[in-house]
Structure formats: structure tokens, C-alpha cells
Amino acid sequence: MSSQLEFTKEVEKNTAGIYQKIKSVVPEIEWPLHAPYIYKINELKKKKNAVILAHNYQTPEIYYGVADIIGDSLTLAIEAEKTKADIIIMAGVHFMAETAKIMSPNKKVLIPDINAGCSLAESITADDVRKLKKQYPGVPVVTYVNTSAEVKAETDVCCTSANGVKVVESLGVKEVIFLPDIYLAKYVALQTKVKIISWHGKCMVHDQFTAEELNQLRKNYPDLVIVSHPECPPDVIRSSDFTGSTSGMIQYVKNKKPKNVFLVTECSMSDNVQVENPTTNFIRPCNLCPHMKKIQLPKIYDCLINETNEILIDNSVIQKARLPIERMIKVGRQSSLS
């Protein structure tokens, strides 16, 4: 990795606006470490016609400092296909970078840390899916985007936490195989008459939250609004005021403007949402995703300057995996028109 860049007057001047925006969530002592990378990365992006896609779980200095496109998995998949950049850097985990490559196969797609994995994606293999299809012949397979390219290639249609119910019901069938998140499967099952055949995958971040924890927080903050992610256990969802995708959670806070809110998800999202909602108090007994936290500014800089950690996927896998993603996006477009 490159040595620490220097915090010069030029760097300070050119990043002052960014710091003013995020100073409530980034300690002043840390800024001289972040700013030089932000400055250099933004310069390099222009020179190389590169774009940085960042998931909502990225830290504020990445999210507001260098990202060109921010959002949930669905947003990033759609934007990866639309970008005119020559290079895509995914400030997210490995399956997100794979999805970007699937949607833009002719672009160079890089990830700052090749080992930024995902407990959900690692919970199932393509062979597991093939076995399930043999066990349940003719039953459509709906796969959460938090999966590898090889798993997507065995899938009929993908979904995200934002559109799982719509995708399942769009198939017009009585039952589906829904992979790999068991909690998201249970959440979808509560909202549809379609029989859900689930897998046992779990997100290591959301699985740690408990209803007891939420109940104790309500005692401490009687007016607390609890907003959870569908990857949480069912009793956590039942104890919440609202459940939705990361983008849905962000929109809920923006619209409702609660006095006190607890986002039952990865820690950095609370920091990012607070920047845009300064009058709301964010309660933070949250959990860190060790995989997302592998994405750091120095790694983004090294990745961009050296064009390392390129995502390479066999063309036959890309072609097979692209179809279920396109079907998912089509469902979203159709529902937005109805």
C-alpha cells in the first residue's frame, strides 16, 4: 500500500467543503489523514475517466468524499449499467463488484480489497442451487443479489431487500425457492401468499440484533423510532416501527424526521444519514460489517492508481447471470409505471 500522503494547504483548501459537510461525524483529528487521499482520488478519477460506486454502508469520508454514485444494491446495479466511465471502482463488497461487471462487461471493474466478502454470499454455492432445483423441479429460483456471479447464473430472477415481494409475485406461481437469506425469506413470506422455500443464510451484521436490545432502548428513549432492515431476525422486525431496504430506511428518516431514531443496520449508515438529517438524534448501538470496513481510502487510491484487483468473470457466467438481474430491474420499472 502507498505511504501516507501529505496534508498540504492545497489539499486543505480543495477539501474544505467536504469536511464542512461531514465534520459532525468525522473527528477533526482524522481529517488530515483522509483529505489527501480524497483530493488525489478525485483528481485521478478525472484523468482516468473512472467512477466510484459506493454502498450506503461505506464510511462518510468515502461516501461523501469520493463516491460519484451512492445507494443500495439495486441502485448500484442499475447505475453500473448506465455509466459512461471507462473504469468502475466498487466501494462495496465482492458480490457488488461482480454485479457491476455483469452489468458492464466491457468496463474495467476494480475493487479496493479483493477479500471484502459477504457472509450471505458465502452461505451458498452454485452447486447448492443446482441441488435445490433437482429437489424442487420446475420451481422458480429467486436469488437475493447478495450472492456470487456463479449463483446468479443458476437463478431465474434476482431481487433486493427493496423489491423481494414484487419480484416473487411477478412470477405468477404458487411457490418459489428464495435464496439465500432466511430472514429476508421470512419477511417476504409474511407479505405474499406464494409459498417460500428458503435457505439458511444470514447476514452476520443483522443477525446480531435482538428484540431484547430494542425493548431496552425504548425504555431508555420513550419516543425512539426504530427502523430495521429485512435481513434482521423476525422478532427484531416485529419490534420495529418501519422495515425497509437501506434506501427505504434513508427515505423514511428523511420524510418522518424523528427526534430519536435507531437504524438497525450497519454503523456507518447512521453517520451518513445524520449528515443529511442534522436535527435527528441517531442512537448507535449498531454493528460493524468487517467486510465493508476493508474498503478504505488508501486502498481506493492504490486500486485506482495501479488499476489492481480487477474483477474477471467468465463470459458464459456473465451472460447467464445478467438475465436474472435484468428481469429484476424490469420488474422494478413495471411497478413504477403501475
PLM region descriptions:
Residues 2-264, 269-338:
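Active-site loop-to-helix "anion-binding N-cap" substructures in soluble metabolic enzymes
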